[in-house]
A protein has these predicted regions:
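Alpha-helical transmembrane segments and their immediate interhelical/interface regions
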Residues: 1-16, 133-144
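Transmembrane helix-loop-helix hairpins at membrane boundaries of multipass inner-membrane proteins
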Residues: 1-6, 16, 20-114
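Short conserved micro-motifs on helix faces and helix-strand junctions that flank
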Residues: 11, 73-74, 87, 128, ...
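Anionic group-transfer/hydrolysis microenvironments
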Residues: 78, 142, 150
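Alpha-helical multi-pass transmembrane bundles of energy-transducing inner-membrane proteins
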Residues: 111-147
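Single conserved hydrophobic/aromatic residue that forms the stacking wall/gate
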Residues: 146-155
Length: 155
């Protein structure tokens, strides 16, 4: 599979998993299982990007908003390592969060994991951002979702 597709799948998988959280909100085991599966799939895509990366920086332009402003993705060694780190940590933090949320009998699990998944999708986008505009598009959702995560049990 071309690396360009893997980049999009690495970003879209956590976002889709976040949406599935809302669909399966009544069944806790299914909801948590789908989210954990999404974390594993995201890590799988990140590993495939790492294995398919030949060491040469590559630029992929998704769309041109106006001349000089593009949504583009850039594959380079540091971004690939960052995506591997973030996706592997998502698996561990997800397992911890399930235990914590259930053990503390917190409410709003689906909402928490929705924002958590969107946050990871944004982090994956940041790791492959090709310019400042794309970085800005993915950084803003990270700031909003990270602001919401600590307050989720109270909302």
């Amino acid at each position: 599979m071309p690396i360009a597709y893997l980049i999009f799948l690495t970003i879209l998988t956590p976002a889709l998993v976040g949406g599935l959280n809302l669909i399966f909100h009544k069944n806790a085991n299914l909801r948590d299982g789908v989210t954990l599966l999404g974390a594993l799939i995201t890590f799988y895509f990140s590993v495939n990007i790492f294995l398919g990366f030949d060491g040469q920086a590559t630029q992929y332009k998704l769309v041109t908003i106006m001349p000089g402003i593009d949504i583009s993705f850039h594959i380079e060694p540091l971004g690939v390592i960052f995506s591997l780190l973030a996706s592997s940590l998502w698996i561990l933090t997800h397992i911890y969060a399930i235990g914590y949320m259930r053990g503390a009998k917190e409410k709003n699990h689906s909402r928490f994991f929705l924002f958590f998944s969107f946050s990871i999708a944004s982090v994956m986008g940041i790791s492959f951002s090709g310019n400042l505009f794309t970085l800005f598009l993915f950084y803003e959702p990270v700031s909003y979702t990270h602001l919401t995560l600590p307050t989720t049990p109270y909302v």
